[in-house]
Structure formats: C-alpha cells, structure tokens
Amino acid sequence: MTVSFPLTAAALREHASDFRAYEQQLALELGGLSGLQINELTFARLTKPDPLRLFGLDGDGEGVLMLGTDQRDMLVPKLSETLLVLPPEGYVLDIGSGDGQTTSYALEGRSEPLSIIPLDPMEDSLRQYQDLFRTRHPEISVPRVITSGIDELIEAQIAGSDTLPEYFHAVISAHSIYFSSSAPGFLSFALDRLHPGGKLLLVFAEGLGRFTGGMTLGYLEKYGLDPEGKERSSQTVLDQMIGLANGTTSRSDCHASLLKALARNDFRVAEVVTQPTRIYGHDLGDMIAFAFINKLPIIDQNLTRQIAYVSQRLQESPDTFDLRVHVSGPRARMFSLAQPQLFLAVEKL
C-alpha cells in the first residue's frame, strides 16, 4: 500500500535555501547544453531503474519498471495487448522511441518474428535501442533506425522519400506527439501508414492537467514569449481533438471529435483510457528538473531564468501540481507530482 502526504507552501517556505541550492546545481549541470540535450538529460531522471527489480530482489511483487514515473507501469500492459498479437513478420513504427525500454517490456513473451523501425532525433538512443533488442529480443528485427523528428519524417514522405515500408501493423507514439507542429497532421500521417486492422497506439499527458505543460505555458505567459498564444493552443489541441472535457472523455465522444478534426472516417476508436500517473524524484532538484522533459528548454534558451521560474512556482503553488512526499510503497521517501496520461488506441478500417 502506498501512503503519501501533500506538501504545502508553508512547509516549503522553510526550505527556501534548499531550493536555491538545487537551482545552482541544475544551472551547473545543464548550462551550455542544447535544448535537446537538456531534454534528454532531465528525462534520464525518470528512467532510473528500480534496484530491487534490477537485481531480482523484489520478492514482494512491489518492483516497478522505472523509479521516476509510474507511466510505464500503466502503459506497458496496454501496449502488450496489441503488440503480442500482431501477425508474424508484422511491422511496427515506434515514433519517439527513445532507447526502446518501454517497447521492449511490452514485447516480453512474444516469440513470433516482428520488425520494428524506431524513430528518434537522438542517435545515442537509437543505438541503445538496437543493442537492447539484439540482446533481449533476438527474434525481433530492427532492420533500420531513423534519426529524425516527426515533422522531418512527414516532410520526407510528402517529398516522395522511400524512408518507410508501405504499411505498418502498429504505430506507437508514446509521449512524442508534443514535438509535432500539427497534431491533426501527425495523426493523419500515422493512419495513412497503417494496414487495415492495424492500430495507432497514442499516449500523451493531458494538456489540461500535466505539470510540464503548465510550467511551459506559465513561463511563456509571464515573460511575454508567446503573444499570439500558439503554445497554449498546441498544448490543448489534443484534448480538444479527442473530446476531452472536464478531465474525462468516452469512446463515442472521442470518435466524434476525431472525425471532425481529421475529416476522414476510415478509423474507429478502439479504446480511450485516462491513467492517473505521476512523476517521482529523489529530491526537490529532481522536481524542478522535470519541467524540462517537455518543450521548455527547446522554445527558450534562458536556462537560469527558466530554473528560477519553475522553482518559484513549485514553492508558491505546490497544490496546483499535487506535490507530495511518499512514506510507503515502492517509491517511499520520494517526491511526486501529478502528470496524468491518456492512452488512445485507434484502429484503421
């Protein structure tokens, strides 16, 4: 059983000096890096393995896939429902693949051959992806990797590039759609590449409830960096596209909203699930750093100002982000913030 307690602004005021120290540490750690490098380095805090599970010592069954978030714990079973029953010799496109850990966990237990093409802008992550599948899934082929962002991939396909196979049996996009300049364009692209009966497995943190999105929007608005509100629109466009209202949606609402947004009817919404996921850190410095796992370090380069802003927001409004400290469970003695995610399975007809 997990027990946690919310932290108040009054309690955090007594630790103002700790926040200043963490701000200085982060400035030293992240200074001089590109936006993508900052994104990758801070994201690594999420993917720290559970040492008990890593060494097979979680005999009580409380081991977790990542210490930094329960998103993978909740997502992997949903991905497995589709990936484990794909036809032999099927093809999968893994967009924003990272190092492949999530997809690898979802494929545990599959013995039939499968081909996966991962796409990610970070070359190191793609090399790790290939090494991981070569070691853990020898029956699954990674015939090639694509070092690219989403927009670049779509532009290449429009230009007539033969970068991709003719079709895929599944397209995975786990927390990568934020980096597309057009959510409707991305979804249409994914549906175009699917074989009839294939599924788009889309995962994203709700624009209306996520810590990272809230921090990015607040920062841009405070310093007047998005006068036309383009970022706010992009942060909420996915919520609007799937019919998310007041934090909930249904398959029928989602389907109706997607029909309108995409102006096509060759799909059906197979499943839509909101998962009450969280992100976890060992100290308050981790919690500040988590604001950089999204677009914040890419859309503005003033790192010192960004760090100070995030730190101040956390201290003044911890209840807005449901900042907590855990006293029991697999992540005891860790801090956490609310970062709900939504899983959407769309089948091509």
Protein language model regions, located:
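Short alpha-helix
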Residues: A245-D266
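Conserved class I S-adenosyl-L-methionine
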Residues: K199-T236
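A short glycine-rich, Lys/Arg-flanked "PGG" loop and its adjoining helix->strand segment in the class I
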Residues: P184-K199
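A short acidic, Gly/Pro-enriched loop at the edge of an enzyme's catalytic core
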Residues: A156-V171
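Class I SAM-dependent methyltransferase Rossmann-like catalytic core
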Residues: A11-L83
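A short SAM/SAH-binding and catalytic strip from SAM-dependent methyltransferases
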Residues: F168-P184
